[in-house]
Amino acid sequence: MHVVIINGSPRVEKYSNTEKIIDAFAEGLAKAGATFERYTISSRKNWDMAREAYTQNTEIIFALPLYVENIPGLLLEFFETLPIKDNNTRVSFILQGGFAEASQLECGKKFLEKLPKYLNVSYGGTLIKGDNFGIRVVSKEDVLKITGPYQEMGKGFVENNGFKAEIVKKFSGPDYLPVPMRIMIQIMFKTIARKKFETVSKEWGAKVPIDYRPWQ
């Protein structure tokens, strides 16, 4: 199997959580004996190469972040430039986001399920997983803990010939977190997590508090 992976995030590679997820997933592909090539669309200068790879290959995976229940506008623009193919080409998706509950990604998943029909290609499934926000703010060791499971999904993609519904469901985690856990998370965000975000914001160059409201 030879797979073309296209990172549909508008964020540059250096700061892209999606790119780090692709790193792990691609390792899994390689472990299962597959080959792959990778492209990003955050810079329009890469579009011609990515489009050519899409045109010349039949196993395509788009990896993307969830933005406000839908996919990035830049990726939609890229889709509009793609040529019409046939169902010999299979398109699959990796949809990731910061929300911990799988239900938060369902709207985006439903859209992606319909998209291959408009591209005139076959659909290979959508792997969804939330709770990925921390990838950008934690240590390298902790990043590997978050992205490590994607390596197994890459291996499974080859061995199972695509994303299988039962595996996707198990990987995505709970649709809704239990009430006690929600309460605990709310407390964490008001205490430990808040301090962490304050530290990170200063490291990123923020000059005002994280709860600053310039419109007031």
Regions found by a protein language model. Give the residues of each.
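N-terminal beta1-alpha1-beta2 submodule of the flavodoxin-like/Rossmannoid cofactor-binding fold
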Residues: 1-85, 162-216
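Short flexible/disordered coil segments
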Residues: 96-109, 125, 152-164, 186-205
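Short, glycine-/small-residue-rich phosphate/pyrophosphate-handling segment
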Residues: 91-145
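A glycine-biased structural micro-motif
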Residues: 87-89
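A conserved mid-domain beta-alpha-beta active-site/ligand-binding segment of alpha/beta enzyme cores
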Residues: 126-189
